[in-house]
């Protein structure tokens, strides 16, 4: 790939993934970024404010995968509920609760409907506080790793607050919400309403919701200028438009900084499901090790490792009701699963630097005999690095717990790789190199474990943390470790305090960052 990547390109790509997570067309968040900048221009805000608004608009929902599990547990399809409530008036709690209940009870039998309604009515405030705290905490951890300053980080802590004090988790109100986030609150809602309904409806909503949901001065600006801004959006390419606005001097990601950014993307992806924690990191490491077994140049190893970090970008577009389903997928569900490498390709190809990773990243489910997806590429058309990642994806996937099965023993996963190779599905050199790198066969290196005492945690604390990060309840953790529920809860609170987090999602991210997934 190109040796450097503009930070704006990287963050704009993350914005595309956030669109997927909310069931919106790609570039929706880019469009809202443009609206936000134009509002800053008309209002005469200084360069510091405009630069902060730019990054906040593109990163607003970067914590969204962190609480996808919690949303899906209650609503089933977390993407659908997000899409349905995206344009609703967050300053009107009664309207939001009504629509949330309607979605949550649709299609359920009467007895189950009553239970869901009762849960929402009794627990809505507590659940929302915890849910939105998760999103903000994860966003802050990820953005800190991208070296953003306090202005961006402070604004993102108010992602779910509202002008009138009806937001979460702190019910902040008025100008206690940072100006950049007040701007983004308005322009992201207006982009969605204008796109889904009409510019006129968006302008009307800005006026109707002023002083309740939005800063009234900003809402008035939108009422006055929104029609012209929507016309500009209609004829502008959002990707090019957003990159043209990137704050100068452009920050270039290269070397370790580029690897760090791509690892942020990997963690953003894997946070989506408790079963995926650390998957992309693990694939990247094993792919790099296998590439060295094959004698790849270090440049080729680096490209393969980076492609492996972002190969699953497309999973953000599919709900956890599919990824975490405990039973067999229907044909229709599996058809949707087969789309995710294509979606990875679509997101990466907008940036020339990231598009160079597509040769391996978007081909991770292809097979040498043409039986894979999404392009059905055969061996004679496949890149050897891509073949390595294909074998890695299978091996790593098999050795991890899934919703419908326990993890394979490493030896059983190795046997399955050999079987697929013998049937022509995997490239022999790639498959054998992966097995050697994973610790199987002649010349194999012993598998390296994670740190023994990450963060100074005891063995028992690590066990508790792993299970909590996977989404197990306190009772389930107690049963798994043969301790009482009360003791398990004590351990969880102690561990969270020790590592400096307050939510399951943040704990899951900490686990990934400190290589204690397994």
Where are these regions (language model features)?
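Histidine- and acidic-residue-rich, metal-dependent catalytic cores
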Residues: 2-449, 456
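Conserved aromatic
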Residues: 407, 501-502
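Key residue(s) within conserved catalytic/signature motifs
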Residues: 60-63, 225, 504-505, 509-510, ...
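Helix-turn-helix DNA-binding segment
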Residues: 270, 449-493, 498, 509, ...
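Short glycine/serine/threonine/alanine-rich loop segments
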Residues: 45, 296, 483, 501, ...
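N-terminal positioning helix adjacent to the helix-turn-helix/winged-helix DNA-binding module
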Residues: 384, 453, 460, 503-504
């Amino acid at each position: 790939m190109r040796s450097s990547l503009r930070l704006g390109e990287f963050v704009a790509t993350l914005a595309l993934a956030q669109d997927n997570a909310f069931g919106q067309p790609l570039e929706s968040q880019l469009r809202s970024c443009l609206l936000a900048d134009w509002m800053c221009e008309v209002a005469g805000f200084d360069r510091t404010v405009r630069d902060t608004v730019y990054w906040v608009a593109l990163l607003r929902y970067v914590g969204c995968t962190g609480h996808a599990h919690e949303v899906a547990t209650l609503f089933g399809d977390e993407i659908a509920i997000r899409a349905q409530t995206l344009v609703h008036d967050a300053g009107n709690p009664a309207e939001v609760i009504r629509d949330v209940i309607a979605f949550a009870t649709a299609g359920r039998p009467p007895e189950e409907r009553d239970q869901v309604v009762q849960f929402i009515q009794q627990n809505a405030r507590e659940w929302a506080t915890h849910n939105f705290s998760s999103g903000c905490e994860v966003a802050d951890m990820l953005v800190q790793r991208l070296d953003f300053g306090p202005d961006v980080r402070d604004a993102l802590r108010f992602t779910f607050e509202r002008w009138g004090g009806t937001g979460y988790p702190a019910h902040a109100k008025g100008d206690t919400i940072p100006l950049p986030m007040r701007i983004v609150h308005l322009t992201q809602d207006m982009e969605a309403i204008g796109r889904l309904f009409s510019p006129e409806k968006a302008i009307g909503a800005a006026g109707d919701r002023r002083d309740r949901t939005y800063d009234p001065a900003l809402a008035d600006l939108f009422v006055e200028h929104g029609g012209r801004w929507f016309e500009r959006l209609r004829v502008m390419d959002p990707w090019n438009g957003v990159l043209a606005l990137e704050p100068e001097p452009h920050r270039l990601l290269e070397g370790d900084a580029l690897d760090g950014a791509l690892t942020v993307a990997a963690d953003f992806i894997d946070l989506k499901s408790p079963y995926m924690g650390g998957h992309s990191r693990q694939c990247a490491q094993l792919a790099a090790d296998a590439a060295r077994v094959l004698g790849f140049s270090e440049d080729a190893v680096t490209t393969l490792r980076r492609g492996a970090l972002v190969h699953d970008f497309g999973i953000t577009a599919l709900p956890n009701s599919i990824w975490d389903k405990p039973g067999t997928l229907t044909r229709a569900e599996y058809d949707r699963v087969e789309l995710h490498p294509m979606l990875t390709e679509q997101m990466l190809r907008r940036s020339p630097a990231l598009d160079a990773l597509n040769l391996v990243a978007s081909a991770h489910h292809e097979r040498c005999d043409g039986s894979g997806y999404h392009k059905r590429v055969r061996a004679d058309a496949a890149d050897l690095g891509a073949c390595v990642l294909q074998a890695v994806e299978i091996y790593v996937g098999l050795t991890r717990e899934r919703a419908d099965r326990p993890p394979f023993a490493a030896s059983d996963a190795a046997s399955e790789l050999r079987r697929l190779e013998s049937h022509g599905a995997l490239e022999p050199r790639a498959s054998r190199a992966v097995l050697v790198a994973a610790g199987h066969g002649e010349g194999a290196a012993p598998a390296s474990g994670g740190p023994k005492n990450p963060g100074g945690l005891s063995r028992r604390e690590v066990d508790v943390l792993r299970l909590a990060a996977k989404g197990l309840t306190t009772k389930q953790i107690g049963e798994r470790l043969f301790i009482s529920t009360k003791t398990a809860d004590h351990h969880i609170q102690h561990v969270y305090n020790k590592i400096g987090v307050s939510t399951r999602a943040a704990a899951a991210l900490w686990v990934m960052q400190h290589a204690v997934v397994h």
